[in-house]
């Protein structure tokens, strides 16, 4: 193994000098290990990643953990390969850090477990699937108005407390239960508390055994936060390429990936670009996003929570992410206040899959009519607020009447929330979703009360609920 010595420490950046021209390659992992000298001291076990060749037999590296205690002259060993992490079934139900070390309270992953390097090429053109296939989620508002594509990338927008985590959990649950699929969750620059809560909530709801979790928390150095998304993606790729699975890959939050890259870029001395971001922003984002795709064997479908700095959608970080997205799911606080869950905004959410050649003519026509009805209702709300319903024409009254039923019917109970609500969760196939809304638009259920449509699954449940309310059906 090639050995070198630490020549300079600049916070999370460490320069290492190697002898006799034995320079490690870019992205190679370098280890610095030193046992504790006494009981009161903590030993050093640090992994670095080579970022630059500076010349004079010296490389500049980024630390994957704190550099506390690292001194000039310490021995550093080139491992001869990039950071490699465990892949396969051993990762399910477990929590890892950026290096693939388990950080849950269970036994360490077996030493002989298969490992893959986190830096890999995106699938070549001949490996890519040319078919556009819809990923059925069982969530009505998503499947009808902003359907997800297998191997696609979805942006999940929403503030604090509007239900991003519950939506993520329900998607993990539905993919596991209905499709037998696997999920990988990457917490990038996450609050440790949120990651901890998510792990225990998923354990309680029973979906953890179909999920691998990787965390690079907010308090960790930028190197760890920048690479943790690649660690999660490497685990997801194995399930796709080796096991032929349709994998869900969650990134929360993709903005933190960019933010960490910006910090690393500044530490490496690169000239900043627009708004202080790294000049390699588009390249780094592309390298990550291009690996998320459908192949002839399986697919990795990514759902990415996106923080928008100061609500400025022209900021380079979110703007670069948008270029890669196939669909957006926007969560709206006003809907949570109305008791509509999931609080997905049916007018702001979009998908390029909502086209007649992909979803079919009937689905497309119903979805567009639902949107136009809700849009007209939105336009009429100001008039209703000022003058009241009585001032509307008969046609507009009918629009409002149906729009409110549609709005309530877009809600449903979630399986993962059963323990809180006491209501059984529902999974609604796309065909039944389309049929239900088609019948509402045709006026078949105009005589039923609005509350019968709230938090139900199939349209038959609306009729049952109305009967329970004492309404003649």
From Swiss-Prot:
Pfam family, any one: ATP-synt_ab_N
Keyword flag Ion transport: yes
Gene Ontology cellular-component annotations: membrane raft; plasma membrane; proton-transporting ATP synthase complex
Keyword set, alphabetical order: ATP synthesis, ATP-binding, Cell membrane, CF(1), Hydrogen ion transport, Ion transport, Membrane, Nucleotide-binding, Translocase, Transport
Highest taxon listed in the record's lineage: Bacteria
Catalytic activity: ATP + H2O + 4 H(+)(in) = ADP + phosphate + 5 H(+)(out)
Record's bilayer topology term: Peripheral membrane protein
Binding sites annotated in the UniProt record for ATP: 158-165
EC number of this enzyme: 7.1.2.2
Gene3D superfamilies according to UniProt: 2.40.10.170, Bovine Mitochondrial F1-atpase, Atp Synthase Beta Chain, Chain D, domain 3, P-loop containing nucleotide triphosphate hydrolases
GO terms for MF: ATP binding; ATP hydrolysis activity; proton-transporting ATP synthase activity, rotational mechanism
UniProt subcellular location: Cell membrane; Membrane raft
Main localization, broad class: membrane
Matches recorded under NCBIfam families: atpD
Subunit structure: F-type ATPases have 2 components, CF(1) - the catalytic core - and CF(0) - the membrane proton channel. CF(1) has five subunits: alpha(3), beta(3), gamma(1), delta(1), epsilon(1). CF(0) has three main subunits: a(1), b(2) and c(9-12). The alpha and beta chains form an alternating ring which encloses part of the gamma chain. CF(1) is attached to CF(0) by a central stalk formed by the gamma and epsilon chains, while a peripheral stalk is formed by the delta and b chains. The F(1)F(0) complex interacts with SpoIIIJ and YqjG; YqgA is found in the same complex.
Similarity comment: Belongs to the ATPase alpha/beta chains family.
Reported function: Produces ATP from ADP in the presence of a proton gradient across the membrane. The catalytic sites are hosted primarily by the beta subunits.
Protein name in UniProt: ATP synthase subunit beta
Gene: atpD
